[in-house]
Amino acid sequence: MPNRGFSHIGLSTLDLDRTRDFYENILKFKAVRCDILKVKEGGQIRHIFFDTGRDQLLAFMEARGVPGVPAHYEAGINRGLGVPNAFYHFAFEAGSEAALVEKRNELIARGVDVTDVVDHDWAKSIYFKDPNGLQLEFCCFTRNLNANDAQLQERAEVSIRRMGLE
């Protein structure tokens, strides 16, 4: 059976309203499913799914008064683990180099701090963060990948700072 890609990626947030505003109004991802789940042990979980394109979804959960779930924690994965920003990130397809530049300009116009376009040889990217501190990326392929690309080898020297926002 062939692989079909992601159904969804699930993440947590401490502020679902702020998260929803960012993903709907800044990134223009449509909310396609919203739930309030009553937890038998107490509290509730608010849950929202965004369509990021091609029926691939990004989900966020916010726990309210759920036993065993801290009221405050670090929702930004990299900060929570103490690793550089680029290590855990989510990349969305831009479609083309022109669309990537257009997306960067749109994000800047909406007040988002965005990196310059980063050229990875096989792709170009921009990096920014959501209100939870999650590292996000828009990316586009600049060429087809080949057998040489699949070989683990030293290719370049990079700056972690260039690949993400401080």
Locate each region found by the language model.
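A short, polar/proline- and glycine-enriched secondary-structure boundary/capping micro-motif
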Residues: 69-74, 147-149
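Acetyl-CoA-dependent GNAT
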Residues: 62-65, 141
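N-terminal beta-strand motif that seeds the catalytic metal site of vicinal oxygen chelate
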Residues: 1-18, 43, 87-92, 144-166
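Alpha-helix termination/capping residues and helix-transition junctions
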Residues: 3, 26, 84, 109-111
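Vicinal oxygen chelate
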Residues: 5-14, 49-52, 71-166
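Core segments of cupin and vicinal oxygen chelate
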Residues: 12-63
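Short Gly/Pro-enriched turn/cap motifs at secondary-structure boundaries
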Residues: 38-39, 81, 116-117
